[in-house]
């Protein structure tokens, strides 16, 4: 994690907090950028480039097999750097939450593969993984918000004048 000024966040006994890997909290970033794009479109060129870059990365990892945690260099983390989901076993999954947020990034993109990410979200199932782990809260809500984004129904609600 970083501080708001971009410096590395240091915690207990001068140790860096976490590994800096892309994982659960990071999943929200593509959808947050899609939200900003939908509501304000303040930096369209950068947002489009970001959307296509992140979708290209996950597509290159296998659209049906990409995992839910990566090192910042794009490699798979070593076992000691994998964060267990919800106290469950330390495994990498093809998580519905990440499928959802990467699909929401399709709002930013003009390339052909965006439709494939939307199709994967549409056909995703909110059910336990093969190992029995199930997170209706995080995976389920990211899935719901992605559907809202892509349907055009995630809007700013303003008071009636």
Regions found by a protein language model. Give the residues of each.
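Extended ligand-binding clefts on enzyme/binding-domain cores
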Residues: 1-115, 137
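Terminal, non-catalytic domain-edge segments
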Residues: 32-35, 39, 105-161
């Amino acid at each position: 994690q970083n501080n708001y000024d971009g410096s590395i966040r240091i915690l207990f006994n001068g140790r860096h907090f976490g590994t800096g890997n892309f994982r659960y909290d990071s999943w929200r970033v593509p959808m947050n950028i899609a939200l900003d794009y939908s509501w304000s479109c303040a930096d369209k060129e950068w947002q489009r480039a970001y959307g296509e870059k992140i979708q290209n990365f996950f597509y290159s990892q296998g659209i049906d097999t990409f995992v839910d945690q990566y090192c910042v260099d794009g490699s798979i983390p070593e076992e000691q750097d994998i964060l267990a989901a919800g106290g469950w076993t330390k495994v990498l999954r093809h998580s519905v939450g990440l499928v959802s947020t990467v699909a929401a990034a399709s709002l930013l993109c003009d390339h052909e593969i965006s439709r494939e990410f939307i199709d994967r979200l549409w056909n995703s199932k909110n059910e336990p993984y093969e190992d029995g782990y199930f997170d209706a809260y995080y995976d389920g809500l990211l899935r719901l918000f992605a559907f809202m984004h892509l349907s055009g129904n995630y809007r700013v609600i303003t008071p009636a004048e």
